[in-house]
């Protein structure tokens, strides 16, 4: 076996990199210095691992070696075929071979190469580090092991390489505080102390705080708040993706995992944390191979390996419950989603950390709004994660505003720029008529420039005060961490000096500056550093597209006027609108069931009386846009097989990936009015589907995803019993009796029983028709105004249109046709013939029982 065959894979890779470096630098020979630079460039290599444990500026060392390489002679033509290893490099490899034999290794490892040739690198390393200290560190990384395989030196310090030490992070105060979850942490410690099967697995939905519970354990270990058995333990999070990454050959992943397990067994004080533990099932498996789960099983069963797993309930069912041998080795701990109050406690605990990070103040009202609004409007995620995200994003938005120029100052600067341009244009024209305007511009510019100077001075002053407050906060945070460190090391004198002398001194200064800042805020400051509930509502609005004001208290006052607002669009249906308004008011007052839709209504009545228009008006009023109306024509679902289109096709059928027409629409617009038009035309099985929505406020689509209907208003329209409603001779009691009879024939009792209101729309009378003509004409008026033409319609003309377009059986729809014929067609002709121009007025009046336009 020659020298090169005795090299480990990692040393071979280092040599290949050294050759590539020599080619890049156009050097004729590969030297030990090229080898050193190649090792410094390998972030996963043993040299970098050793240097990271020492107080060394690695980047400065790299630059020093780079400058040494630049001194080497360059040749014009060099290729991989004619490049040579110089004598010094071959000698260095032989030196490493000698050390290999002394150590009892079977292959030349990278650390052996470094240790055998430290004298070659001393001149370049000495200014940056103690070479004896480096030798000691390299020896400690070996931990007395011998290299018996080509791949063995890749797995030295496997745990360091593929894991993140959470206890070390807790020691350095790099973990967020963990609030609550005491019960779960105690149960986890209980399981870890067991003799066998001492492996807890945390189960819970994404975002409920599984990883935080493990971080809480790491913090308790550091603070010595754990039983004696766990006192000196290290919690190391295993990075599975890093373990799999770069495993080129079959069995390499398994080899790495085995080394990690061996290291954990030998150290005896490591608790391995595997997040997303379901990924170990099948990881690394190939034909005839063994997956990671099977490698872990024996060690887990014997209690040699302390492991904490974390996964979701869905993944646990999918992977663990199928593999009973793996399942019985873990003890499940279920983490439920915290309540709003528990989430609020967590947010209050994280408040200081977030304030320090973003350099702002977070009001308690913002924390309350975050917990409540996220629970109410962001239904596809879980507390506390979604509430923390809201606070974090709101704080980031505020920080951006703080670091940008204030809007008021920017506006003044833009105004100055605009006036300067106008001034230059007037100077170029040099007309006498421009003199007055020029004087006005000069006066405005003078005032604006003065205002700009004042605003800039105010901005600078506020910035200085804020910077000083931020600096003091950072210093106090640093002092608190220092005091914690002294306490842990038992130096209580130093800790007391910090807590009772240095921190109070800083707090006093900070209070004075805070008082100054508050005075600035009261006097109309340019900078706002406090996160409020309005900021949180704004972020929720960006996420969900729900208008901001809908989430705030001011909306309740607006809802009081809902009836009059709806009557502006829907005429002659006072009774129906009153019933709708009452249901909406109940919801806004918080008296309706929060697990059901905001309201569910069945609108009955003949065609053209305002059923669909009421739904549109409601969408406009509640959500500021008709676009928040999800309209589904139920006549498309007459056949039984078509019903599946509402929730999505079953697996294996065409359209499965597309989702359901109803469920997808509500998922995209969770805050909307859902209108199921002409519902009696649909197949009867549709109503079975709607029972779940009306009762529980959610519907499960074909993919098993739960779609929330709690923020929707469900309106079903129907022409059932329209005959009874059109009968003039029938009394109100007889009409109601006929309606009930018709409903019983068409709908099942369990469906009718779940509706909030069954609302009857009456046939329209002549007075209502005239009002509708007015509303329809307003739309024509708006279109004409866009062209700069003002049009009017007198009362007699309205009556004539109402008379021509009214039909008791067809409702208000024929009115549109009458308006087209009697007004719009005539107006269109005048525009196309250029008889009317912009800023003209046209009055439509009655002459000889006909509507004629009069141009003014």
UniProtKB/Swiss-Prot annotation:
Record GO cellular component, one term: cytoplasm
Domain Clp R: 4-144
UniProt-listed PROSITE patterns: CLP_R, CLPAB_1, CLPAB_2
KW Coiled coil (keyword) present: yes
Region (Linker): 338-545
Coiled-coil annotated spans: 388-522
InterPro entries, per database record: AAA+_ATPase, ATPase_AAA_core, Clp_ATPase_C, Clp_N_dom_sf, Clp_R_dom, ClpA/B, ClpA/B_CS1, ClpA/B_CS2
Record key words, sorted: ATP-binding, Chaperone, Coiled coil, Cytoplasm, Nucleotide-binding, Repeat, Stress response
UniProt: ATP 2 binding residues: 605-612
A Pfam family of this chain: AAA_lid_9
Region named NBD2: 555-763
GO terms of molecular function: ATP binding; ATP hydrolysis activity
Region (Repeat 1): 7-72
Keyword ATP-binding listed: yes
Biological process terms in GO annotation: cellular response to heat
Location of region: NBD1: 157-337
Region (Repeat 2): 85-144
Protein task: Part of a stress-induced multi-chaperone system, it is involved in the recovery of the cell from heat-induced damage, in cooperation with DnaK, DnaJ and GrpE. Acts before DnaK, in the processing of protein aggregates. Protein binding stimulates the ATPase activity; ATP hydrolysis unfolds the denatured protein aggregates, which probably helps expose new hydrophobic binding sites on the surface of ClpB-bound aggregates, contributing to the solubilization and refolding of denatured protein aggregates by DnaK.
Subunit text: Homohexamer. The oligomerization is ATP-dependent.
Domain notes: The Clp repeat (R) domain probably functions as a substrate-discriminating domain, recruiting aggregated proteins to the ClpB hexamer and/or stabilizing bound proteins. The NBD2 domain is responsible for oligomerization, whereas the NBD1 domain stabilizes the hexamer probably in an ATP-dependent manner. The movement of the coiled-coil domain is essential for ClpB ability to rescue proteins from an aggregated state, probably by pulling apart large aggregated proteins, which are bound between the coiled-coils motifs of adjacent ClpB subunits in the functional hexamer.
Protein name as catalogued: Chaperone protein ClpB
């Amino acid at each position: 076996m020659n020298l090169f065959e005795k090299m480990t894979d990692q040393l071979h890779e280092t040599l290949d990199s050294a050759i590539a470096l020599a080619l890049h630098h156009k050097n004729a020979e590969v030297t030990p210095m090229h080898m050193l630079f190649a090792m410094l460039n390998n972030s996963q290599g043993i040299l970098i691992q050793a240097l990271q444990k020492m107080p060394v500026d690695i980047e400065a060392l790299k630059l020093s070696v780079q400058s040494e390489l630049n001194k080497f002679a360059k040749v014009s033509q060099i290729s991989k075929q004619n490049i040579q290893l110089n004598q010094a490099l071959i000698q260095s490899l032989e030196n490493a071979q000698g050390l290999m034999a002394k150590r009892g290794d079977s292959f030349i490892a990278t650390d052996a190469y470094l240790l055998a040739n430290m004298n070659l690198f001393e001149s370049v390393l000495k200014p940056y580090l103690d070479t004896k200290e480096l030798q000691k560190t390299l020896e400690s990384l070996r931990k007395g092991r011998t290299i018996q395989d080509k791949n063995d030196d890749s797995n030295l310090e496997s745990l360091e390489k593929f894991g993140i030490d959470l206890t070390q992070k807790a020691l350095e105060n790099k973990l967020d505080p963990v609030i609550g979850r005491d019960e779960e942490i105690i149960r986890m410690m209980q399981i870890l102390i067991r003799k066998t099967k001492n492996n807890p697995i945390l189960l819970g939905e994404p975002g409920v705080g599984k990883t935080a519970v493990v971080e809480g354990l790491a913090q308790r270990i550091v603070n010595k708040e754990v039983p004696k058995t766990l006192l000196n333990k290290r919690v190391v999070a295993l990075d599975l993706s890093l373990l799999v990454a770069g495993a080129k050959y079959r069995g390499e992943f398994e080899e790495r995992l085995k080394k990690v397990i061996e290291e954990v067994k030998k150290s005896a004080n490591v608790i391995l944390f595997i997040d997303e533990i379901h990924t170990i099932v099948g990881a690394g498996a190939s034909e005839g191979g063994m997956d990671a789960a099977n490698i872990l099983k024996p060690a887990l069963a014997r209690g040699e390996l302390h492991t904490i797993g974390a996964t979701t309930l869905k993944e646990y069912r999918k992977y663990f419950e199928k593999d009973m041998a793996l399942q019985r080795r873990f003890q499940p701990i279920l983490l439920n989603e915290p309540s709003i109050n528990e989430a609020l406690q967590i947010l209050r605990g994280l408040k200081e950390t977030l304030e320090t990070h973003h350099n702002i103040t977070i009001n308690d009202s913002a924390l309350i709004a975050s917990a409540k609004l996220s629970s109410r409007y962001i239904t596809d995620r879980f507390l506390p994660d979604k509430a923390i995200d809201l606070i974090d994003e709101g704080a980031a938005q505020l920080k951006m505003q703080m670091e940008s120029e204030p809007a008021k100052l920017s506006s003044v600067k833009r105004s100055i720029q605009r006036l300067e341009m106008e001034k230059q244009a007037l100077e170029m024209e040099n007309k006498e008529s421009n003199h007055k305007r020029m004087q006005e511009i000069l006066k405005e510019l003078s005032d604006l420039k003065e205002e700009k100077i004042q605003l800039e001075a105010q901005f600078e002053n506020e910035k200085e005060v804020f910077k000083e407050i931020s600096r003091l906060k950072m210093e106090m945070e640093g002092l608190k961490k220092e005091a914690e460190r002294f306490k842990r090391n038992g130096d209580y004198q130093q800790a007391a000096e910090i807590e009772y002398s240095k921190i109070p001194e800083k707090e006093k200064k900070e209070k004075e500056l805070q008082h100054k800042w508050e005075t600035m805020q009261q006097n109309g400051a340019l900078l706002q550093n406090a996160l409020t509930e309005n900021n949180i509502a704004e972020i929720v609005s960006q996420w969900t597209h729900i208008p901001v004001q809908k989430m705030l208290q001011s909306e309740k006052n607006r809802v009081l006027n809902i009836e009059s607002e709806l009557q502006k669009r829907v005429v002659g249906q006072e009774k129906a609108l009153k019933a709708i308004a009452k249901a909406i008011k109940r919801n806004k007052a918080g008296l309706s069931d929060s697990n059901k839709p905001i309201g569910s209504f069945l609108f009955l009545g003949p065609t053209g009386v305002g059923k669909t228009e009421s739904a549109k008006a409601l969408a406009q009023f509640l959500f500021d846009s008709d676009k928040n109306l999800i309209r589904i024509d139920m006549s498309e679902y007459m056949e039984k097989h078509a019903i599946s289109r509402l929730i999505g096709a079953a697996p294996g059928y065409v359209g499965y990936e597309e989702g359901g027409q109803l469920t997808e629409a509500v998922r995209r617009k969770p805050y909307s009015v859902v209108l199921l038009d002409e519902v009696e035309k649909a197949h009867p099985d549709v109503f079975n589907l709607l029972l779940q929505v009306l009762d529980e406020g959610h519907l499960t689509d074909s993919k098993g995803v739960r779609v929330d209907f709690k923020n929707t208003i469900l309106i079903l329209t129907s022409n059932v019993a329209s005959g009874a409603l059109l009968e003039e001779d029938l009394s109100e009691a007889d009409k109601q009796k006929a309606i009930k009879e018709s409903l019983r024939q068409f709908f099942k009792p369990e469906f009718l029983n779940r509706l909030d209101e069954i609302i009857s729309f009456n046939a329209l009378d002549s007075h209502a028709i005239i009002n509708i003509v007015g509303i329809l004409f307003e739309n024509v008026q708006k279109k004409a105004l866009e062209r700069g033409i003002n049009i009017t319609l007198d009362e007699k003309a309205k009556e004539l249109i109402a008379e021509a377009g009214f039909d008791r059986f067809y409702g208000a729809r024929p009115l549109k046709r009458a308006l087209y014929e009697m007004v719009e067609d005539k107006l269109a002709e005048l525009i196309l013939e250029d008889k009317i121009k912009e800023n003209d007025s046209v009055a439509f009046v009655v002459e000889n029982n006909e509507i004629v336009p009069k141009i003014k």
